[in-house]
């Protein structure tokens, strides 16, 4: 399929009135029952546009526009999954506002823990500010190089801290992940038998 020339500003900064206006952003794929709204380098500059628009709007809840726009098409899909950068920005805030549930991967390091605590604060603030009911649904460990002492310690620590919200399946490091990204192919079709693919299936 031809890649659409997407005006992300319309999606993030304008309240669409018709479902058809939002569906124009969606592209079909070669994979059954999977459609995609592709990302772009343009998103890196959109954060400034969102900031400027929020100031121009005089307090209008522009962070909720993506949520509104996706709500127009939610009945057309079983799930809408937002794969988002952990970097805290206006885009991240819009994505969190648009979500009903948040699941986040964490690496075996203290930076992931610090980011997780910041995410909890953000969810709590947005729920309070906009009367939302965003649920933190769970975490899982990723990019696991091996069952090292540090990994075991952090696994046990997260398990004790989060209970049922800590998903007990860890995604192991696997060269096939990088290779599939390079070829723009889903991991499950690139190498379904690799360790990471099996871990994701179990997850």
Label for each model-derived stretch:
Residues 1-203:
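P-loop NTP-binding core
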């Amino acid at each position: 399929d031809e890649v659409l020339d997407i005006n992300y500003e319309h999606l993030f900064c304008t309240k669409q009135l018709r479902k058809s206006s939002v569906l124009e952003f969606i592209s079909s794929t070669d994979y059954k029952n999977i459609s995609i709204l592709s990302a772009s380098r343009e998103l890196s500059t959109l954060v400034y546009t969102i900031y400027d628009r929020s100031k121009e709007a005089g307090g209008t809840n522009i962070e909720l526009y993506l949520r509104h726009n996706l709500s127009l098409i939610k009945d057309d899909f079983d799930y809408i999954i937002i794969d988002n950068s952990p970097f805290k920005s206006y885009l991240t805030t819009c994505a969190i506002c648009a979500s009903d549930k948040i699941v986040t991967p964490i690496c075996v390091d203290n930076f992931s823990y610090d980011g997780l605590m910041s995410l909890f604060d953000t969810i709590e603030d947005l729920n309070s500010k906009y009367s939302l009911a965003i649920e933190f649904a769970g975490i899982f460990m990723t990019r696991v190089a091996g069952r090292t002492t540090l990994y075991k310690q952090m696994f046990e620590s997260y398990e004790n801290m989060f209970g049922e919200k800590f998903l007990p399946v860890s995604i192991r490091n696997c060269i096939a992940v990088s290779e599939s990204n390079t070829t723009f192919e889903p991991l499950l079709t690139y190498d379904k038998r690799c360790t990471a693919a099996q871990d994701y299936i179990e997850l």
